[in-house]
């Protein structure tokens, strides 16, 4: 018998109703987006402007408000491809290692003689010893600083390779440690870029690693690529160093272990600093814009426990000495230590504007990029172009939908109309699922929807053609409908599973636009199996139970 149990009917109707309700906010995109932005602003600040209150009132709070996010090509925005300078991290590792090496080798001075650091290529640390004949002993002692690499691919290897070349001990990062360092650096860079972009209030950015040392950044809705570069391109590397001396000579001699940096405010003034910082921005727990004693914009900061201890110990032992605050290779402040600073907090003053102080605090809170970046590609897509893309995509979708509906009704009559209703519900499922999972719609994604519109009725074509064959062979209408669904099922499942797997491979191996196409196609395929089989079958069962026709025309 042509029957569907009550609970199955309720489940099918419930899923269809849920999809239509969840997808509905996308029909009022601007209104719902304004409502969501106002709610988000209220959650952050606890207050709303009159404009935000009006925007919030434009959409009911009880109604669904999940939207499909528009990608860069539909909303407009900025695209950047950045290269991370991994070599800087290698150098920083060697610089941080030097004090430990100096300590262990100094303990062997009676045997190996005097030690001194000599210039080294990037990623190496070279220490010259006084007693050339004792190089083997120096290498043996230095190797005690090497530790096992913490990674699956580096099992059995140490982080440093220590060798002797003449009278010089040479430290190098092992290949396993380089790979592990690269992965950590890229992961940290991705996270910090994501924090900075999120802190600026942008919507649904795409931030992902490409290759060994590159990061793809796409932010819809931002004004320009330059604005995005200003937001994420600053390293915001904050360090605190002892000041050894000041000079106006940019070519003043610099001993090994020291560095000469320019003053950010006073042109022509340079500070000779100890290269090893007392504390770094990694020890910061908070940074906020504030004002100094004169009411000028400044930035307050606070260290974590270890940073506060190191900062307090240093200030206690160096009262009356200058102390440099270095940001991105420039000395932004070099105050004299007036007293022991035990609280682990302080203030950065300078000739900041309010906006500069706010931006600096944001960057410091987000954390310092572990290495500098070079932008290899930059592209700005204007909102007008994005709007044109949305319009073109909508036109293509409507034309495709109307053409498919016209063909199905012309070919299969009332049953074609049932398929058209199911097709509309299928599209609603795509938008409902995309909105629920926070997916981003791109121009290729719209192409995936158009493709789904054309292919989702394939299952019904197979079913209807099978029904026609059964009717021609003399079967009753009820039996023809049952056999049409039953005998076409295996072909429908096989075709859709292979298509789904192909789209899944595109999603896994592809990137950017290809993944957008794959996502909408996979959702469309999954929805089409449900709508073409169960939704259409339910409509036919309800119609047949109501009309009880002696014959059916398909």
Curated annotation (Swiss-Prot):
Its membrane topology: Multi-pass membrane protein
GO biological process, one term: protein targeting
TM segment ranges: 10-30, 392-412, 414-434, 435-455, 491-511, 516-536
Keywords annotated in UniProt: Cell inner membrane, Cell membrane, Membrane, Protein transport, Translocation, Transmembrane, Transmembrane helix, Transport
A GO term from the CC aspect: plasma membrane
Lineage top rank: taxon: Bacteria
Keyword DNA damage (UniProt): no
Subunit structure: Forms a complex with SecF. Part of the essential Sec protein translocation apparatus which comprises SecA, SecYEG and auxiliary proteins SecDF-YajC and YidC.
Protein name (record): Protein translocase subunit SecD
Organism (species): Rhodobacter capsulatus (strain ATCC BAA-309 / NBRC 16581 / SB1003)
Lineage: Bacteria, Pseudomonadati, Pseudomonadota, Alphaproteobacteria, Rhodobacterales
Gene name as annotated: secD
């Amino acid at each position: 018998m042509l029957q569907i149990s009550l609970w199955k009917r309720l489940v099918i109707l419930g899923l269809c109703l849920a999809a239509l309700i969840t997808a509905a906010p996308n029909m009022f995109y601007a209104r719902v987006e304004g409502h969501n932005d106002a709610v988000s602003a209220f959650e952050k600040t606890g207050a709303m402007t009159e404009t935000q209150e009006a925007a919030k009132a434009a959409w009911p709070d009880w109604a669904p408000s999940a939207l499909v996010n528009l990608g860069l090509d539909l909303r407009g925005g900025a695209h950047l491809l950045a290269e991370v300078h991994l070599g800087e991290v290698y150098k920083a590792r060697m610089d941080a290692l030097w004090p430990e090496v100096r300590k262990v080798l100094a303990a062997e001075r009676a045997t190996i003689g005097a030690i001194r650091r000599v210039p080294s290529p990037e990623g190496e640390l070279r220490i010259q010893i006084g007693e050339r004949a004792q190089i083997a002993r120096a290498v043996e002692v230095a190797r005690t600083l090497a530790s096992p690499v913490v990674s699956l691919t580096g099992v059995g290897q140490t982080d440093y390779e220590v060798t002797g070349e003449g009278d010089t001990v040479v430290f190098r990062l092992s290949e396993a440690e380089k790979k592990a360092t690269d992965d950590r650096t890229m992961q940290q860079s991705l996270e910090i870029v994501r924090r900075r972009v999120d802190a600026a209030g942008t919507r649904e950015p795409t931030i992902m690693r490409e290759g060994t040392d590159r990061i793809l950044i796409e932010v819809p809705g931002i004004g320009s690529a330059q604005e995005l570069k200003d937001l994420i391109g600053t390293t915001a590397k904050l360090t605190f160093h002892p000041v050894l001396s000041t000079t106006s000579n940019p070519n003043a001699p610099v001993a090994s272990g020291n560095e000469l940096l320019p003053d950010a405010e006073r042109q022509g003034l340079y500070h000779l600093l100890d290269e090893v910082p007392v504390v770094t921005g990694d020890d910061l727990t908070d940074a906020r814009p504030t004002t100094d004693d004169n009411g000028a914009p400044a930035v307050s900061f606070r260290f974590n426990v270890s940073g506060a201890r190191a900062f307090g110990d240093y200030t206690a032992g160096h009262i009356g000495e200058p102390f440099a605050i270095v940001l991105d290779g420039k000395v932004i402040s070099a105050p004299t230590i007036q007293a022991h600073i035990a609280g682990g907090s302080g203030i950065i003053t300078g000739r900041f504007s309010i906006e500069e102080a706010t931006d600096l605090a944001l960057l410091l809170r987000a954390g310092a990029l572990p290495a500098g970046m070079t932008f290899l590609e930059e592209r700005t897509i204007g909102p007008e172009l994005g709007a044109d893309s949305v319009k073109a995509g909508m036109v293509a979708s409507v034309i495709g939908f109307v053409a498919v509906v016209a063909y199905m009704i012309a070919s299969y009559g009332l049953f074609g109309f049932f398929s058209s209703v199911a097709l509309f519900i299928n599209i609603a499922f795509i938008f409902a699922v995309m909105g629920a999972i926070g997916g981003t719609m791109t121009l290729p994604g719209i192409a995936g929807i158009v493709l789904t519109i054309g292919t989702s009725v394939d299952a019904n074509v197979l079913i209807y053609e099978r029904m026609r064959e059964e009717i021609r062979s003399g079967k009753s209408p009820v039996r023809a409908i049952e056999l049409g669904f039953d005998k076409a099922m295996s072909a429908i499942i096989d075709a859709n599973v292979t298509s789904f797997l192909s789209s899944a491979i595109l999603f896994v191996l592809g990137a950017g636009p290809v993944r957008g196409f794959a996502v909408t196609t996979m959702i469309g395929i999954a929805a089409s199996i449900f709508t073409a089989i169960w939704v259409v079958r339910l409509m036919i069962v309800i119609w047949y139970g109501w009309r009880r026709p002696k014959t059916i025309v398909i």
